[in-house]
Curated annotation (Swiss-Prot):
Residue ranges of the region described as Leucine-zipper: 434-441
Keyword vocabulary terms for this entry: Coiled coil, DNA-binding, Nucleus, Transcription, Transcription regulation
Sections of the chain in a coiled coil: 77-117
BP term (GO), one: regulation of gene expression
Chain residue ranges for the region called Disordered: 153-237, 277-305, 349-390
Superkingdom of the organism of origin: Eukaryota
Protein name: Probable basic-leucine zipper transcription factor I
GO MF, one example: DNA-binding transcription factor activity
Species for this entry: Dictyostelium discoideum
PROSITE patterns: BZIP
Length: 741
């Protein structure tokens, strides 16, 4: 199928082409209407209808005429014209649609035909491409590549023929060999001229010039070695061959100036021929090994190379015109040196294989003005050339060794760098691993500590909960005992007492605020209120003393082992070491004068004397009451009293016990009255501000309830500390002791 085949339009893309045709078709009816349509003109004044040819009548003109004052019913001709125009438009629309449908069908048929043609083409056998990808990543035409290979294969044949040792029995065959080679060269020259005429293969004569020159040199060398005389016909043929070669070179030089791209392609072809010439000089085994290695390398490179790079290398390279002309000269020089080496090898082999030459006539030397080759080589020149070659080989070997050493050093440096990087990475990884291990250990230790701490807290919480439960149980048991005995009901303050205590506390707070405001009138009024509340408190002290001195409470206190230390009603601010320090601070704050301080000291001394006497008497009475209970109701282990003393008492004993309880009550009352009297005497000595300061610093009478509560708590605390073995044994009851005789 031709490469210049038109591109296929798919049915979807064909619509774009059709729309242009449709736009042209739509314009045709407009032109036809302007030329063919004839519209009747109407005379509205006379009512007669006249038909005239009007070009370009549209619906707009008809609508304007219809919208006039006259009615449509009186104009049937206009209606007919409108209907006629509508029919024409419908017909045109139908025609356009049919044409579009026909165009679409045609394009679909063409598309299907082209698809079938492409399928048939792909089913055909494979045809090789016109270009071949060379070993040096260059594109070379297929015919040119095959011709180059054929021409390269021909010189080795001539060389093989030269390398064969000439036998003494066949001198005429040696004479025929150069004739055959000259004929072959003439045929090749004719072929090159034919290829030059073709535009695609203009490069071939230049490419094959070098092998021809090499063959001519071989022929000349052989002609020197043959003992027979050269024929004049052969000399003429050589001259005829050399002359067209010079002409070809003269033709190539202007072509190189005109066509730089062709010159670049020639350089590429020469570079391709160099390794082939070197391979021909090597033995066949080495050539086969090199070919196998090249195939393996090409396979590996093709496998390792990605698709994008393969596509890039398969594309033609057009940027090589930057190469300079001196590269071609280098390649020519290298090829000439190779040819000279081949000549020398052939000469040495022929000398070894051939017998000593027979005497013969000297060979005439022919010098052509046009040729540049030398037909005879002296032994001195050969030695010089050999020395030069040896020097070149030694230099090349030195350069190669240096390059190898440099490469080894570079490889060693790269290996060292890789090892250093590996060591660094290994060290980093080892450090990271050590850090991770340490972090893991630290995390484990922290978690273990956290767990231990949580366990300790949980244990403490459990202990506290157990203690709380124990206290709850003890309180419940105490409440049951109190409700049974009725002691709590007796010791609890009445609501009246609670109100008095609250009033006294509120008055003391108001006094403190008045001191801050420095309002003397308000202070005096509040002090009168305070003294009135204290007077009410006197009446309640007698009842409190009776409750404490009752036989039931004393029995409970005796069973517990409570020892009375001071009055349970009021705090003592006048006696003891703490009172001394407190009074000194109070004097400084209240700015008390020397006279006031002397009077205060006298009052304190008197209070201490009377208070000590009362406390001694209270302790004596308390011990006698407890002794009575221990002898008659219950017994401790310390007392050596028999258990048979629980008989009812006599009247004298009962009266004596009652008197002791009454004396105890009076002593409690006297102690409380002593406190009130001393406080009233202090109010007479101090000013209102000083007295207010004293009340604010120590709220004496408002602490009564707290002292009572403290007394009860101390009682039950002593009871809980006592051991079970020290508990008293109950041997009687108050009701039995105080029975009437």
């Amino acid at each position: 199928m031709d490469e210049s085949f038109n591109s296929i339009l798919e049915p979807e893309n064909a619509w774009l082409f059709l729309f242009d045709d449709v736009s042209q078709l739509q314009q045709l009816p407009i032109v036809q209407n302007n030329q063919e349509n004839f519209i009747n003109s109407i005379d509205f004044n006379t009512g007669d209808v006249t038909t005239t040819n009007i070009s370009g009548l549209n619906f707009q003109s008809l609508e304007e005429s219809l919208n006039s004052d006259t009615s449509i019913e009186n104009k049937p001709q206009i209606i007919e014209q409108i209907q006629f125009l509508q029919q024409q438009q419908q017909q045109q629309h139908d025609q356009i649609q049919q044409q579009l449908h026909n165009f679409q069908q045609q394009y679909q048929q063409q598309y299907q035909q082209r698809q079938q043609q492409y399928q048939q083409q792909y089913q055909k056998p494979y045809t090789p491409p016109s270009f071949i990808y060379s070993e040096k990543n260059d594109l070379v035409p297929q015919q040119q590549f095959h011709l180059g290979q054929e021409n390269l294969q021909q010189p080795p044949q001539s060389l093989q023929q030269q390398q064969q040792p000439p036998s003494p029995s066949s001198p005429p065959q040696q004479q025929q060999q150069p004739q055959q080679q000259l004929q072959q060269l003439q045929q090749q020259h004719q072929q090159h001229q034919q290829h030059q005429q073709q535009p695609q293969f203009q490069q071939l004569p230049i490419q094959h010039e070098l092998p021809q020159q090499s063959q001519l040199q071989h022929i000349q060398i052989q002609s020197q070695q043959i003992p027979t005389q050269p024929q004049p016909q052969q000399i003429q043929k050589q001259i005829q061959i050399e002359q067209p070669q010079v002409q070809v070179q003269q033709q190539i030089q202007p072509q190189q100036q005109i066509q730089p791209q062709q010159h670049i392609q020639l350089q590429q072809h020469i570079q391709l021929q160099q390794p082939q010439i070197q391979q021909q000089q090597l033995p066949p085994q080495t050539i086969q090994q090199k070919e196998i290695n090249k195939k393996n390398q090409s396979k590996q490179s093709s496998n390792s190379m990605p698709l994008s790079q393969q596509i890039f290398f398969n594309t033609p390279k057009l940027d090589q015109h930057l190469l300079s002309y001196f590269q071609t000269q280098k390649t020519n020089n290298t090829i000439n040196t190779l040819n000279v080496d081949q000549k020398r090898d052939n000469i040495e082999k022929q000398k070894e294989n051939t017998s000593p030459p027979t005497p013969s006539s000297p060979v005439p030397t022919i010098i052509n003005s046009n040729s540049t080759d030398i037909n005879q080589i002296s032994p001195s020149q050969q030695q010089q050339q050999q020395q030069q070659q040896q020097q070149q080989t030694t230099d090349i070997n030195k350069i190669l060794t240096l390059q190898q050493l440099e490469q080894q050093q570079l490889e060693y440096q790269k290996q060292q760098q890789q090892q250093q990087q590996f060591n660094l990475t290994f060290d980093d990884e080892s450090k990271k691993s050590i850090k991770r291990i340490n972090q893991n250990i630290a995390n484990r230790n922290f978690r273990q500590r956290k767990k231990d701490h949580i366990k300790d807290i949980e244990d403490k919480m459990m202990e506290l909960t157990l203690e709380n439960e124990k206290l709850k149980k003890e309180n419940e048991s105490i409440r049951q005992q109190e409700h049974e005995g009725g002691t709590m009901a007796i010791l609890k303050p009445s609501p009246e007492k609670k109100q008095l205590m609250l009033e006294i506390r509120s008055i003391v707070r108001q006094i403190g605020e008045a001191l801050k405001e420095d309002n003397e009138k308000n202070l005096i009024y509040l002090l009168h209120m305070y003294h009135g509340a204290v007077a009410k408190r006197y009446s309640s002290i007698d009842k409190d003393a009776e409750q404490i001195a009752s036989p039931e409470i004393q029995l409970r206190l005796a069973s517990i082992g409570y020892v009375l230390k001071s009055t349970p009603f009021l705090t003592n601010i006048f006696q003891g070491i703490e009172s001394d320090s407190w009074f000194n601070l109070f004097k400084e704050k209240a700015n008390i004068t020397s006279q006031q301080s002397v009077q205060l000291d006298i009052i304190r001394e008197k209070y201490c004397e009377y208070n000590l006497k009362l406390l001694d008497e209270i302790h004596d009475l308390d011990s006698e009451v407890k002794k009575f209970f221990f002898q008659n109701i219950f017994v401790f282990q310390s007392y050596s009293i028999s258990l048979k003393t629980s008989k009812p008492l006599d009247l004298s004993q009962q009266i004596e016990f009652a008197c002791k309880l009454k004396l105890l009550k009076n002593k409690f009352f006297e102690n409380s009255c002593l406190m009130f009297e001393t406080f009233s005497s202090l109010s007479k000595i101090l000013t209102p501000k000083q007295e207010a300061l004293l009340l604010v610093e120590i709220d004496i009478f408002s602490c009564f309830n707290l002292k009572k509560f403290e007394m009860i708590t101390n009682v039950w605390a002593n009871k809980s500390k006592m051991k079970k073995s020290s508990d008293p044994f109950k041997i009687g009851d108050l009701s039995q002791i105080f029975e009437k005789p």
